[in-house]
């Protein structure tokens, strides 16, 4: 049994109502519930946290090094394009991570094309709406089974 950490960045608490044509109508609570259930069915525990504050996400990443977290799944949202702090935190704890995006940032405004995390992530899954999270979790579960 592995402990997994799912982090959601700024404004993702508004999922379901914020720009549904871009992000869909599925709420964050619905995404989290489905992923917690899927992780549990695979014999793992998934812990979820959403924050609009960069330092809260950084502190949770730091805590992951000591609390038995095996893998981090992260949708950094707008912090993707700005946060050296998240990058440094992820590198500092040395845990594998997957970067997730609901939309395809490469098909959007040019300022969204750069990620401070992608080159260090085990993988990046984007553009599949709420399914991006499910696909990321399935990839992590497969990786854990392969490495067991």
Swiss-Prot record:
<feature type="binding site">
    <location>
        <position position="112"/>
    </location>
    <ligand>
        <name>substrate</name>
    </ligand>
</feature>
<dbReference type="GO" id="GO:0003855">
    <property type="term" value="F:3-dehydroquinate dehydratase activity"/>
</dbReference>
<feature type="binding site">
    <location>
        <position position="81"/>
    </location>
    <ligand>
        <name>substrate</name>
    </ligand>
</feature>
<dbReference type="GO" id="GO:0008652">
    <property type="term" value="P:amino acid biosynthetic process"/>
</dbReference>
<feature type="binding site">
    <location>
        <position position="75"/>
    </location>
    <ligand>
        <name>substrate</name>
    </ligand>
</feature>
<dbReference type="InterPro" id="IPR036441">
    <property type="entry name" value="DHquinase_II_sf"/>
</dbReference>
<comment type="subunit">
    <text>Homododecamer.</text>
</comment>
<dbReference type="InterPro" id="IPR018509">
    <property type="entry name" value="DHquinase_II_CS"/>
</dbReference>
<comment type="similarity">
    <text>Belongs to the type-II 3-dehydroquinase family.</text>
</comment>
<comment type="pathway">
    <text>Metabolic intermediate biosynthesis; chorismate biosynthesis; chorismate from D-erythrose 4-phosphate and phosphoenolpyruvate: step 3/7.</text>
</comment>
<keyword id="KW-0028">Amino-acid biosynthesis</keyword>
<dbReference type="GO" id="GO:0009423">
    <property type="term" value="P:chorismate biosynthetic process"/>
</dbReference>
<dbReference type="InterPro" id="IPR001874">
    <property type="entry name" value="DHquinase_II"/>
</dbReference>
<feature type="binding site">
    <location>
        <begin position="102"/>
        <end position="103"/>
    </location>
    <ligand>
        <name>substrate</name>
    </ligand>
</feature>
<keyword id="KW-0456">Lyase</keyword>
<dbReference type="Pfam" id="PF01220">
    <property type="entry name" value="DHquinase_II"/>
</dbReference>
<feature type="binding site">
    <location>
        <position position="88"/>
    </location>
    <ligand>
        <name>substrate</name>
    </ligand>
</feature>
<comment type="function">
    <text>Catalyzes a trans-dehydration via an enolate intermediate.</text>
</comment>
<keyword id="KW-0057">Aromatic amino acid biosynthesis</keyword>
<protein>
    <recommendedName>
        <fullName>3-dehydroquinate dehydratase</fullName>
        <ecNumber>4.2.1.10</ecNumber>
    </recommendedName>
</protein>
<dbReference type="GO" id="GO:0019631">
    <property type="term" value="P:quinate catabolic process"/>
</dbReference>
<feature type="active site" description="Proton acceptor">
    <location>
        <position position="23"/>
    </location>
</feature>
<feature type="site" description="Transition state stabilizer">
    <location>
        <position position="18"/>
    </location>
</feature>
<feature type="active site" description="Proton donor">
    <location>
        <position position="101"/>
    </location>
</feature>
<dbReference type="GO" id="GO:0009073">
    <property type="term" value="P:aromatic amino acid family biosynthetic process"/>
</dbReference>
